[in-house]
Amino acid sequence: MSSAVPLNVGITRSADSGASRADGEKRVLLAEPRGYCAGVDRAVETVEKALEKHGAPIYVRKEIVHNRHVVETLSDQGVVFVDETDEVPEGALLVFSAHGVSPAVHESAAARNLRTIDATCPLVTKVHQEAKRFARDDFDILLIGHEGHEEVEGTAGEAPDHVQLVDGPDSVDAVTVRDESKVIWLSQTTLSVDETMQTVARLRERFPSLQDPPSDDICYATQNRQVAVKAMAPECDLVIVVGSRNSSNSVRLVEVALGAGAKASYLVDYAREVDPAWLDGVRTVGITSGASVPEILVRGVIDLLDEHGFHDVQPVTTANETLVFALPRELRAART
C-alpha cells in the first residue's frame, strides 16, 4: 500500500549553503509532508466524535497522541486523560490512544465494565498482528524501539514470552535467542529509519538468519517526514521542528536534520519557544513538524519568522500523502 508519490524537491540551491546567501536575503524552507498523519487524524477525530456522540466526560488512556496542544485542547472540551484503567469510573467510556495497548489493558477495561473505543493506529495494529503471528510460530521476536514508549509496551504485551526489546544498536550485544534459525525483527513505527537499519545490521551480524518483517513497520508518515527533512537540511542554517518532547517521531526529526547537514536544529511546541538568538546570522530556516502536530502551530512559527524578516517561504515537497483511515466502527456513521 503506497500513500505517497515522489515529487521534485525543487529547492533553489545557494552556492555553498544557506549562510552564503546575500545579506538580507532570508528564506524559509517548509517541508512537505509534515504534521498530521492518517493515524493521528483518525485518533483525534475519534475523540472529537466520541464527545459529540456521548458528551463529556470521556476518558482517554495515556495521551491520545503525543502533542501538548492537542491534549490541552481536548482537556478543555471535557476529555479526562488517565494513566491506567483503574482511574476510570466503572461503566464509563474509555478511548485507547493511537499508540495501542496490550491484551492485558483490554482485559482490565472489561473487568471494570468500561465501554471502550480503540483509536489505535491501523499501522500499529499491523505490528501487533505480526507479533502474535510469529509468537504462534514460536519465533524469538526482536522488537526495535524505545523502552517505556506506549507503543512498544502494547506490542510487547501481545507476546511477552517471545518479545525482546532492542533499544538501538548499543543494545544488540545483550540479545539472546533460543534458536538462531527462528528470529525476526519488528519495530516501533516512529523510529529513525537510518538508526533502525543500523540496529538491524548489527543484529544480522550476530544472527545471520534474522528475518525481516513481512512489510515495513516504520510507518509511511515517519519515513516521509524524515525524507523531506533530509532534502532541505543541507541548505539550512537552522531547522525548527514543531513537536512535543515526548513525541518519538518529532525528536527523530531533530536528529535527522542534524545528521543531514543542518547547522542547528531545535524542537518547540509553540512559536513562543523560539529563541530569537537562534536566528542570529541565519539566512535559511527549515521548518517541519511531527506527525501529531496540528498545522496551526506551524503557522505560528512561520508568522514569527516573518516578523524577523523571513518573508520568502519555499515549499520542499518530497511526497504527497493521500491515505485516510476509517474511524472505529462505533463512530463511522458520525464522520462527515
Curated annotation (Swiss-Prot):
Pathway noted in the entry: Isoprenoid biosynthesis; dimethylallyl diphosphate biosynthesis; dimethylallyl diphosphate from (2E)-4-hydroxy-3-methylbutenyl diphosphate: step 1/1; Isoprenoid biosynthesis; isopentenyl diphosphate biosynthesis via DXP pathway; isopentenyl diphosphate from 1-deoxy-D-xylulose 5-phosphate: step 6/6
Binding, dimethylallyl diphosphate: 66, 99, 149, 247-249, 292
Residues at which [4Fe-4S] cluster binds: 37, 121, 219
Catalytic activity, as annotated: isopentenyl diphosphate + 2 oxidized [2Fe-2S]-[ferredoxin] + H2O = (2E)-4-hydroxy-3-methylbut-2-enyl diphosphate + 2 reduced [2Fe-2S]-[ferredoxin] + 2 H(+); dimethylallyl diphosphate + 2 oxidized [2Fe-2S]-[ferredoxin] + H2O = (2E)-4-hydroxy-3-methylbut-2-enyl diphosphate + 2 reduced [2Fe-2S]-[ferredoxin] + 2 H(+)
EC class (word): oxidoreductase
GO biological process entries: dimethylallyl diphosphate biosynthetic process; isopentenyl diphosphate biosynthetic process, methylerythritol 4-phosphate pathway; terpenoid biosynthetic process
Residues that, per the record, bind isopentenyl diphosphate: 66, 99, 149, 247-249, 292
GO molecular function ontology, one term from the record: 4-hydroxy-3-methylbut-2-enyl diphosphate reductase activity
Active-site annotation: 151 (proton donor)
Family matches, as InterPro entries: LytB/IspH
Protein's name according to its UniProt entry: 4-hydroxy-3-methylbut-2-enyl diphosphate reductase
Organism expressing this protein natively: Rhodococcus opacus (strain B4)
